[in-house]
Curated annotation (Swiss-Prot):
Reactions that this protein is recorded to catalyse: glycyl-tRNA(Ala) + H2O = tRNA(Ala) + glycine + H(+); a D-aminoacyl-tRNA + H2O = a tRNA + a D-alpha-amino acid + H(+)
Assembly and binders: Homodimer.
Cross-referenced InterPro entries: Daa-tRNA_deacyls_DTD (IPR003732), DTD-like_sf (IPR023509)
Record Pfam families: Tyr_Deacylase
Lineage of the species this protein comes from: Bacteria, Pseudomonadati, Pseudomonadota, Gammaproteobacteria, Enterobacterales
Chain location of the short sequence motif Gly-cisPro motif, important for rejection of L-amino acids per the record: 137-138
Protein's GO biological process: D-amino acid catabolic process
Protein name stated in the entry: D-aminoacyl-tRNA deacylase
HAMAP family membership: Deacylase_Dtd
PANTHER family: D-AMINOACYL-TRNA DEACYLASE 1 (PTHR10472:SF5), D-TYROSYL-TRNA TYR DEACYLASE (PTHR10472)
Organism: Yersinia enterocolitica serotype O:8 / biotype 1B (strain NCTC 13174 / 8081)
GO molecular function: D-tyrosyl-tRNA(Tyr) deacylase activity; Gly-tRNA(Ala) deacylase activity; Ser(Gly)-tRNA(Ala) hydrolase activity; tRNA binding
Entry-linked Gene3D superfamilies: D-tyrosyl-tRNA(Tyr) deacylase
Entry keywords, A to Z: Cytoplasm, Hydrolase, RNA-binding, tRNA-binding
Amino acid sequence: MIALIQRALSANVVVDGEVVGEIGPGLLILLGVEQQDTEQKAQRLCEKVLGYRIFGDENDKMNLNVKQAGGSVLVVSQFTLVADTQKGMRPSFSRGASPAEADRLYQYFVAQCREHGVKTETGLFAADMKVSLVNDGPVTFWLQI
């Protein structure tokens, strides 16, 4: 399971001209689900993402996690993160979980974020989404479990 996390001043997701998820300061989390992923991996990745200290403290040192910084998260499914790009000029998505399993684990990841007490917004699984982000920094990390 892969999470590409971006520290955001704001972010939103639009589907069919309608905003379906929106946050102020916090994290935009692009989530890719691989074939061998499990609920345990989703839980571990969620804990890592929410615990990752990439927000500035009183000395402007990256020392606070999203909850400590008072931020929220916007979780967006992103199957292209699991692409194999090593050969040729076209990505292969054979490592990706089936759509049903990817949706199940995506929803599980979202539920875990909410259980940790972090305000959590989402995109719409498998939809054609327009994602907007004001990246703060920019600060972007690739986390994989």
